[in-house]
Regions:
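Hydrophobic alpha-helical transmembrane segments of multi-pass membrane transport proteins
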Residues: 2-4, 23-24, 50, 66-80, ...
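Helix-loop interface residues and adjacent transmembrane-helix termini in multi-pass membrane transporters
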Residues: 4, 30-32, 86-87, 143, ...
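Residues that define the loop-to-transmembrane-helix transition and helix capping
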Residues: 8, 34, 90-91, 147, ...
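Hydrophobic core positions of alpha-helical segments in small-molecule transporters
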Residues: 13-14, 36-39, 62, 69, ...
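C-terminal transmembrane-helix exit sites in multi-pass transporters
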Residues: 17-39, 158-178
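Transmembrane alpha-helical segments that form core, pore/gating elements
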Residues: 21-23, 55-111, 122, 204-208
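Hydrophobic transmembrane alpha-helices of multi-pass small-molecule transport proteins
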Residues: 23-24, 33-53, 70-74, 97-104, ...
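C-terminal-most transmembrane helix of multi-pass membrane proteins
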Residues: 53, 154-208
């Protein structure tokens, strides 16, 4: 999708995953989206649209379609992992990444040899950026709803300009700042509301 449309379009449409989970989560998981969930989804998508406003384009229908399919696949993966909340989702993640490796093997064989720095970067990406983050994701999905596991990571692309600013002093646009603030605020308020709701439902220390 990133080769057939803009990066902004691809990222925004991939994060349509919360919509698919809100629609299908009730059927497959029994987790029905609440009014607060839909409000959060609308705020997040609105904020991300504003965040990427400078780069969004209406063309590139094929690339945009592939990005939507990517979001649907992300939602499907999350629902499948949440379905295993009482067992161990890690095995499914390992098998999925092994399958991805097998599919990508023909391109690896024909690629130029990696330098030492390339192998170091590949190792870090495999163990930290993917391995450790997937391990955390598998643990988190046991304790939160499928919708929450895709809403909270939305802050990841929003924080990218912050790291760029710290590393290169490149300032994000006003649209990016405004959109990012909306997304972070919506996700934070949703998380606080969820914590309070679960705290109110939890039995007290003297409950029998």
């Amino acid at each position: 999708a990133t080769k057939l449309t803009t990066a902004a379009n691809a990222i925004l449409l991939q994060y349509s995953a919360p919509i698919w989970i809100a629609l299908f989560g009730a059927w497959f998981l029994g987790e029905r989206a609440t009014r607060a969930d839909w409000f959060t989804i609308a705020a997040v998508l609105g904020g991300m649209t504003l965040f990427f406003a400078d780069s969004l384009e209406l063309a590139h229908a094929l690339g945009n379609s592939l990005a939507v399919i990517s979001g649907l696949c992300f939602a499907g993966m999350t629902i499948a992992l949440r379905k295993q909340k009482d067992s161990s989702p890690v095995e499914s993640i390992i098998l999925g990444n092994l399958l991805a490796f097998i599919i990508g093997l023909p391109w690896i064989i024909g690629a130029p040899a990696l330098s030492t720095s390339g192998w170091i970067a590949l190792t870090l990406l495999g163990t930290v950026q993917l391995g450790f983050s997937y391990w955390l994701y598998a643990r988190a999905i046991k304790h939160v709803t499928a919708l929450e596991t895709v809403l909270i990571p939305v802050i990841e692309p929003i924080l990218n300009p912050v790291w760029v600013l710290l590393a290169t002093s490149e300032h994000p646009s006003r649209f990016a700042l405004g959109g990012g603030a909306i997304v972070i605020t919506a996700v934070t308020l949703r998380a606080i509301a969820t914590i309070r709701t679960r705290g109110a439902r939890a039995p007290g220390p003297h409950a029998t």
